[in-house]
């Protein structure tokens, strides 16, 4: 239905885009509402005080919003009323807040259209590389590469301090000028009024109150900077491979030749300097990235300075150096994609025999290791209201109105997803504590619903009611290792298994990346 309604605004090849009229279409806001309901199992809709119905599901308010947007300067007046009512505590401020949220979510749906059109030509090739889309496919690559590297840059990707920079970057993806003007108007009014409340933190407030729109703007910015970054990285391969010359006098010494390359990128019209590093790997997920190198400490330090200057001179904002940490792999662990990863050094002795002589050779082997971050996971459970900050299980009041089967199914689904996602951990025993918290939280939620105690509930329903919370990993149904597999996975709490059917990070681990 939506595809038929979009045909009048878009060309098949995406060359002509008339996105601005979509802002006044009611079904756009319906799509935004449906996305909000299905985005996470932790979604908890707000209710309008005194009215008793879900604010995001009200088609009446959406129709009123569209009618007001047809009027001149209505968006400015709406946001002005919202911010003025915040100071005086007026009840109608919620309606203005609703207008701001719906405009933000509706425009985010529209902004996703140009990105989705770029994926249409390659839709036939996606099934062939389905396994490569899995998040877990990154870890075998890290196991193979990072164990031989010396240093890693742990990077928190900075974001522009001004929202106008994000709009300018979005122009590369959206050619509809009225839509960009509308976005500028919305962001300009939001920025001006929030500076009265929280100066210098406008973009932080915007990212929390308009998560979906901010994610679109942020992803376009990351895509742009990675395009330039990868372009420069590819250019470095055309440099000469000789990086040093040997001279023989009394002793051997080496004169290191630093290779620099002059690159002029048409989009920025600036000269960018790039250091040659043949052994470098870059991995990113959301706002965090790691840059690993086999080079020396001096080379990795130059990489840090280069990245700071790269963001400063090409995106016009200052990246704080403390957001980029230089760490040696030998004594450092980093959090990435819901795992705590490190390179373990295992000493071993090898017995060699030459003729009749025996001697021992001490060797060191490096192994890439991943474990479950228990304390951060408990913090995520605390944010989701499953336990206290200390890890004491509590009931989930908002789920107490559901049926018993739905409550057990929701808690059980969380446990199964956690076991499935953290199957690559070398120490799965630490997940038992997380399962215990969820099991007791489920029991307390059921006891709250039936107005009973946990002990009486388990005596009445039986202790086997919550058995699925301690299901072993080899019993979890998976398209890679089905339950009817012919070979048992003995010792699966020690074996690491990477599944190729996981295309998004677990919700609980997702809280950690954006916190």
UniProtKB/Swiss-Prot annotation:
- The coiled-coil segments of this chain are none
Extract one GO molecular function annotation from the record. Answer: RNA binding
Mind telling me which Pfam families this protein's record contains?
Intron_maturas2, MatK_N
The answer on whether this UniProt entry bears the keyword Plastid reads yes
Q: Which GO terms describe its cellular component?
A: chloroplast
Give the top-rank taxon of the lineage listed in the UniProt record for this protein.
Answer: Eukaryota
Compartments annotated for it: namely: Plastid, Chloroplast
State the UniProt keywords alphabetically: Chloroplast, mRNA processing, Plastid, RNA-binding, tRNA processing
| Sequence similarity | Belongs to the intron maturase 2 family. MatK subfamily.
The record's PANTHER family line, in alphabetical order, gives: MATURASE K (PTHR34811:SF1)
Q: What does this protein do?
A: Usually encoded in the trnK tRNA gene intron. Probably assists in splicing its own and other chloroplast group II introns.
Q: What is this protein called?
A: Maturase K
């Amino acid at each position: 239905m939506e595809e038929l309604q979009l045909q009048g605004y878009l060309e098949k090849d995406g060359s002509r885009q008339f996105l601005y009229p979509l802002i006044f279409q009611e079904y756009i806001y319906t799509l935004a509402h449906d996305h909000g309901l299905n985005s996470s199992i932790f979604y908890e809709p707000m209710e309008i005080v005194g009215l008793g119905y879900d604010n995001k599901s009200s088609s009446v308010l959406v129709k009123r919003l569209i009618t007001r947007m047809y009027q001149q300067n209505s968006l400015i007046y709406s946001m002005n009323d919202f911010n003025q009512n915040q100071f005086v505590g007026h009840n109608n401020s919620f309606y203005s807040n609703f207008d701001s949220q719906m405009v933000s979510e509706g425009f985010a749906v529209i902004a996703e259209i140009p990105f989705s059109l770029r994926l249409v030509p390659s839709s036939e090739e996606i099934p062939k590389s389905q396994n490569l889309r899995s998040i877990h496919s990154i870890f075998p690559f890290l196991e193979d590469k990072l164990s031989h590297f010396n240093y890693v840059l742990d990077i928190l990707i900075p974001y522009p301090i001004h929202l106008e920079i994000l709009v300018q970057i979005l122009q590369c993806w959206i050619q509809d000028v009225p839509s960009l003007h509308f976005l500028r108007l919305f962001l300009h009014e939001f920025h001006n009024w929030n500076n009265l409340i929280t100066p210098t933190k406008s973009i932080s407030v915007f990212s929390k109150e308009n998560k979906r729109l901010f994610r679109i703007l942020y992803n376009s910015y990351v895509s742009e900077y990675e395009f330039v970054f990868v372009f420069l990285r590819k250019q470095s391969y055309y440099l000469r491979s000789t990086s040093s010359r040997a001279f023989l006098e009394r002793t051997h010494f080496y004169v290191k030749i630093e290779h620099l390359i002059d690159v002029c990128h048409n989009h920025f019209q600036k000269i960018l300097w790039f250091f040659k590093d043949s052994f470098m790997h870059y991995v990113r997920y959301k706002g965090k990235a790691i840059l690993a190198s086999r080079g020396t400490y001096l080379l990795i330090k130059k990489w840090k300075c280069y990245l700071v200057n790269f963001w400063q001179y090409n995106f016009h904002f200052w990246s704080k150096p403390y957001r980029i940490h230089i760490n040696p792999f030998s004594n450092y662990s980093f959090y990435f994609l819901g795992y705590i990863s490190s390179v373990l050094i295992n000493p071993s002795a090898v017995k060699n025999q030459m003729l009749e002589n025996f001697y021992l050779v001490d060797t060191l082997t490096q192994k890439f290791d991943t474990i479950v971050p228990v304390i951060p996971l408990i913090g995520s459970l605390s944010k989701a209201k499953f336990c206290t900050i200390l890890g004491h299980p509590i009931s989930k009041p908002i789920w107490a109105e559901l049926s018993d089967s739905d409550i057990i199914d929701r808690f059980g689904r969380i446990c199964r997803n956690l076991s499935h996602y953290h199957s690559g951990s070398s120490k799965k025993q630490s997940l038992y504590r997380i399962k215990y918290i969820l099991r007791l939280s489920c029991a307390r939620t059921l006891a709250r619903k039936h107005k009973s105690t946990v002990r009486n509930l388990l005596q009445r329903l039986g202790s086997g009611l919550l058995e699925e919370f301690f299901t072993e990993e080899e019993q979890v149904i998976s398209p890679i290792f089905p339950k009817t597999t012919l070979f048992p996975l003995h010792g699966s709490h020690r074996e690491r298994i990477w599944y190729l059917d996981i295309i998004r990070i677990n919700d609980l681990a997702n809280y950690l990346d954006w916190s």
